[in-house]
Amino acid sequence: MPPFISHFFLLSTFASLALCSFYCKNPGYPCLNGGTCLYNGECNCTSGFRGFNCGLDSSTISAACTVECHNKGICYNGDKCYCTKDYMGPTCQQAYDFADCNKSSMKIKAYRPTEFNGEMFLMQSMFGCKLAEVTSTIAGYKQYELDVPHDSTGPCKLKKTIDATTGDVHFEVNVSTIHHAGQFGMYDGLKTVSCHYSSRDQAIVKDVTNQDLIVSVTASDGSTPNLQEIPSNDVIHLTFKPVNLPGGYKAVKILDLEMYSVVEQWNEINSMVLLKDQCMTQKADELGYSVSNEVDGTSGRAILKAIPLFENVPAPVHFNYRLRFCRNRCILKSCASPSLKPMPKGEIFKHQGQGIRIV
């Protein structure tokens, strides 16, 4: 057969590959409990049985279950899960085809029945991008893997897209399965596996202090830097600036922030949690600290009112904090707005100035 005819046959066969994972005409995918394999690769179940392979006895389906079945799995016998055709495991938590999304690569993995004697490869290159069989981590299945670097430029190159707004990065690739080596048929499959790297998620959390030389922490009133004293009820700008972040990380934001004061002669300490999981706490709001959590370029900044923790005692305030480091830029979560507080009954309303007219 001339080479160009063979090449055309290969391309046209790829175009006809199916998208589903179970075909009873393929080795290792039988119809159970007396089910019949139809011409289209689906199972026709006998009375009382159901499911893609007729493997579920309808009389055993449980309304109450002691386990949680994932990915649309069905609970039976009270503590077991019958999975859909694309998932496996005790609670249907494991996909047959998936990827481990690593820092610099995408490791493609797949499980197949022990009767499987075919091949798996990336759609764009049958010969250069095969998944290799490795020692299986799940009994009763064969396991296949291929580790593809994110920056691969060869035949195994991944499809990469970047969200211009969020900076999120998405990699994907089509994985072909043929059930008879060197042969293509209408019951062979094609699956898309992907990795999504969110600019919010690509980060690490670390307890830090100034001695770690990872960030510098400065306090100001918005104009004068590195303040050591600030009048009560003035505004504090507390800035966390990256200095020597771990490899690959460029920006920082504040997760948690606590202010505390110690009066040594009384052996007492007072503290106030200002930010929790990036948002101002209800108590800080009620006591008037008016905390704002912000991102300024690569730095994280908290702006708050300077309210002493001890009345009439000049005790310095200190801060405990937890930070998140981000690879590109940090994006803050959306926090619920503080609730409006009604004026107590009998309170005389006082105001000064002409105010602002809202039009």
Curated annotation (Swiss-Prot):
Residues 21-55, 61-93 form the EGF-like domain. Residues 1-20 form the signal peptide. InterPro entries: Dev_Signal_Modulators, EGF-like_dom. CDD domains: EGF_CA. Prismatic layer of shell (at protein level). Expressed primarily in the mantle with highest level in the mantle edge and lower level in the mantle pallium. Keywords: Disulfide bond, EGF-like domain, Repeat, Secreted, Signal. Disulfide bonds join 24-37, 31-43, 45-54, 65-75, 69-81, 83-92. Its main location: secreted. It is found in: Secreted. The keyword Transferase does not apply. GO terms for cellular component: extracellular region. It comes from the Eukaryota. PANTHER family: EGF-LIKE-DOMAIN, MULTIPLE 7, EGF-LIKE-DOMAIN, MULTIPLE 7, 8. This is EGF-like domain containing protein 2. It comes from Margaritifera margaritifera (Freshwater pearl mussel).
